[in-house]
Amino acid sequence: MKTTNLLTLPNDRQLAYAEYGDLNGHPVFYFHGGGTSRLEPLLLGDEEFTRLGLRLIAPDRPGIGQSDFQPNRGFSDWTKDVIFLADTLGLDKFSVLGVSSGGGYVAACAAKIPDRLYSAVVVSGAWEFTTADLLKSNRWSFLLIKYLPWLYRVSMKLTQRSLNAPPHKLLKNLKKALPRADYTVLEAPGRLQKSCEALN
């Protein structure tokens, strides 16, 4: 497992990516969800990917984690980054897996580069929804993004700062905010720390 690898793309942007599991295993590009990064697979653990015979390659999307921002980009721009990374790693074919908002990037790869893919999988993909479908905290986020983006940025900085709180305080706050099933997952030993790493 190597959680930080940096690659310079042809347009001089930096792309950060992590690798998990068996380096000789079946190659799978993992596209993280919203609000997380290339560290999201830490939630499952490197040993799980090794056990499954997978080589998981998890890049940060532009402007996330340690990858440089790319102005005016669309979903299809992502496929160029994926192809360059795959070529750099010597991978002719690979699978793609996207979680939540990473699903749109899987769809872009399936549409633009089907000849390079073994398979394309979306897990808990984002859907067309209204704010009424969301948890109250997420509803507020969408409204802030739309009407007061500067205030959303401030709230995200405060949220990020709260992730550095002592674990017992953080768990107490999360217990109030999360559904019981999600909170139960975070109570497992080491899970909270890995979740915080993925979000930072």
Give the role of each language-model region.
Residues 150-200:
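Alpha/beta-hydrolase
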Residues 77-95:
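Conserved acidic catalytic loop of the alpha/beta-hydrolase fold
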Residues 13-66:
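Conserved HGGG/HGGXW glycine-rich cap/lid loop of the alpha/beta-hydrolase fold
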Residues 1-6, 18, 200:
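An N-terminal hydrophobic leader/cap segment in hydrolases
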Residues 92-136:
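Conserved hydrolase catalytic core segment
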Residues 120-162:
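Flexible "cap/lid" loop of the alpha/beta hydrolase fold
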Residues 69-74:
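Short glycine-enriched, charge-decorated loop/helix-capping segments at active-site entrances
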